[in-house]
């Protein structure tokens, strides 16, 4: 049994960095920078993002994934033999970030939401490829 742990703090930090980058790139920095936020709303978005990741992995790995949220931490337990676990964790974290960023941009800069949704779609496909590939037993 292998476990992937994705932390809210890591994802939220990435969302803040990404919003600052996008804001600077498209000259809407003050509009999209994540300074004031509702913690309960952010945790709900994080739960939605991780549920999205869980659905992708559950469908591909055909195994039950237990997802639990304890003090801002999502733990997914994967009962599968897969040698890409670190890459899967990294991609899952980035996918959760893209999902939350898209939700943030819908509120702050709807004209830029397509950028985040495209990133989310690409990361979903990458996660599918990583989860699907398993090294053959020798």
Labelled PLM ranges:
Residues 91-103:
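Elongated alpha-helical scaffolds
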Residues 1-85, 115, 122-138:
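Conserved short "hinge" loops at termini or chain/domain junctions
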Residues 104, 108-113:
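Charged, low-complexity interaction regions
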Residues 109, 117-120:
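Short, solvent-exposed helix-helix connector turns and helix-capping sites enriched
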């Amino acid at each position: 049994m292998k476990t992937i742990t994705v932390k809210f703090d890591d994802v939220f930090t990435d969302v803040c960095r990404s919003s600052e980058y996008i804001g600077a790139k498209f000259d809407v920095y003050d509009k999209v920078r994540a300074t004031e936020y509702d913690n309960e709303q952010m945790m709900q978005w994080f739960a939605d993002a991780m549920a999205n990741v869980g659905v992708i992995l559950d469908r591909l790995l055909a195994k039950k994934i237990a997802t639990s949220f304890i003090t801002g931490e999502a733990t997914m337990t994967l009962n599968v033999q897969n040698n890409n676990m670190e890459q899967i964790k990294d991609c899952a974290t980035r996918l959760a970030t893209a999902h939350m960023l898209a939700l943030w941009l819908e509120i702050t800069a709807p004209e830029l939401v397509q950028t985040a949704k495209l990133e989310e779609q690409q990361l979903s496909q990458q996660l599918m490829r990583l989860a699907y590939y398993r090294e053959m037993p020798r």
